[in-house]
Amino acid sequence: MQCFSFIKTMMILFNLLIFLCGAALLAVGIWVSIDGASFLKIFGPLSSSAMQFVNVGYFLIAAGVVVFALGFLGCYGAKTESKCALMTFFFILLLIFIAEVAAAVVALVYTTMAEHFLTLLVVPAIKKDYGSQEDFTQVWNTTMKGLKCCGFTNYTDFEDSPYLKENHAFPPFCCNDNITNTANDTCTKQKAEDQKVEGCFNQLLYDIRTNAVTVGGVAAGIGGLELAAMIVSMYLYCNLQ
């Protein structure tokens, strides 16, 4: 009985933490959606890399709602000893765990396919909005400066972009010796072609692979917590009268 009470208390505390994390994600998501520029000024390249591939604001809001609801469900189920709530909590967490494993496998096995898919989404956006949409341009500038890269694939992503049409040059990040913007020389097509600055997608993959141990450790830690939460919820479910 003491063991059951201890596990029940730990379940409540753990899910209270999850509940608060969900609320924080929701708040940050709303912040990014309303004022992405100030978010970038604070977090810089740490946040901007992912903003090329997904709408981070909406993504964080969606993730926050799920985590918020999951934390509430876990707290409610443990506190009221509701078998229905505990089983619902278990199955939602199981689905999330399976989705994460599937996403990891797809990312590892189908990297080339993912790159092609993202290229179809991101490159047209660069050609359309870089140089005309302030927030979009700032996100890319922060990313290219932080990762020392150029475009999604390379400098050709900026062809026909508003920036190129207005400045008759490519972004300085596409020319290694002009990144600091101290030189008078503009980043011409010939210069960008000669410099061969890596695209941000490949650079991001390189950074992830370089820090594979850290990334893997974080992923394993999250997976371990999810498994532990599922085991505890099932233990409580099975020991309730």
Curated annotation (Swiss-Prot):
It comes from the Eukaryota. Residues 35-53, 112-214 are extracellular. InterPro entries: Tetraspanin/Peripherin, Tetraspanin_animals, Tetraspanin_CS, Tetraspanin_EC2_sf. One of its GO terms (biological process) is protein stabilization. Glycans are attached at residues 141, 154, 178, 184. Pfam families: Tetraspanin. It is a multi-pass membrane protein. Keywords: Glycoprotein, Lysosome, Membrane, Transmembrane, Transmembrane helix. GO terms for cellular component: cell junction; lysosomal membrane; nucleoplasm; perinuclear region of cytoplasm; plasma membrane; vesicle. Residues 1-11, 77-88, 238-241 are cytoplasmic. Belongs to the tetraspanin (TM4SF) family. This is Tetraspanin-1. It comes from Pongo abelii. The lineage of its organism: Eukaryota, Metazoa, Chordata, Craniata, Vertebrata. The gene is TSPAN1.
